[in-house]
Amino acid sequence: MGEAYTTEFIKDNIENFKSFFTKLNKERFIVKELAPYIYELAPIKKTSVEKVIGLMALNHGNEVGGLFVLLEFLSLLDKGLVNLPGKITIGLGSVESAKLGKRFFEKDLNRCYGDVIGEGKDFQRAKVIMEAFKECHMSLDLHQTQTPSAQPFFPMTFNTKTFELIRAIDPQASIIPQKPYDQKGKGVPFSHYLVNRGCTAVTVELGTMGLDYKQIYYGVQLILKLLNYNLGKEPEEFRGSFFPKRGPVFPPGPDAWLRSDLGNFSEIKKGEVIGDYDGGKKWMAQESGFLAFPKAIRGLKRTQANENEPIYILLDRDPDYLKNRE
């Protein structure tokens, strides 16, 4: 887990993000406010780079790590330690809920993108964000997990372009390939929406929610490598791992909890006691694999109340994933 912080601290740093764009060197950058807490930033000197990069944080208001990644990146720009090769759109998503320490208001902002019609602050914010990021050719959306994560990872809509982008920014990445969302009348995550519009967009889960300096460093490195990729740098050979989904796992009974030491990418074995349910009955794993997105870990707040929903996703590690797609 990361360092402790208060909502006042987050409020202050959200305003620091905003104030950066009034303080940035106007002799080096052209700054344009596209919407509240969303800005377009371009170098004064024209470059041959035409592709626009999008950088997003706080699509979930309680996943604050991405905010500090963007602040650190802006600090490097301001100090002249990083050159901007072309135009970027950089913004914060669920700002008002972040100021309250909430994940969202009435509706998950990261399920409000696309053709879905809805009312309320979250849908209104999604419309503003979609308009602001409409010119992006590549995008990186910074997230954190609600339950412990052994490592950063990329849940991605698999296609050649998204894979090449991940390979460019982290050739040792752990990737969970996902099927494209059905957008008809439904809200979808930000990156899925952009991919469906032709943008090469990826989401990174930096790690467990909180203020973690290793995550900030990692996130900034991803952005710097993304800038280099936009300049034409070839990706390295992929040395990471694919973890395709085998399927959802439902609780064996009421009041089910996973062991306190489990989290994202924990490896479990068939027959292993992975938790308890119904007043202390042993919960035995039916299959071996790796956990993803666990919803109820003993000692942590349950992230879902409905016992009819999956309590975790079971993953495989597939060294031949790319070969099998050919």
Language-model segments: residues:
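Structured catalytic-domain cores with a bias toward divalent-metal coordination
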Residues: M1-E326
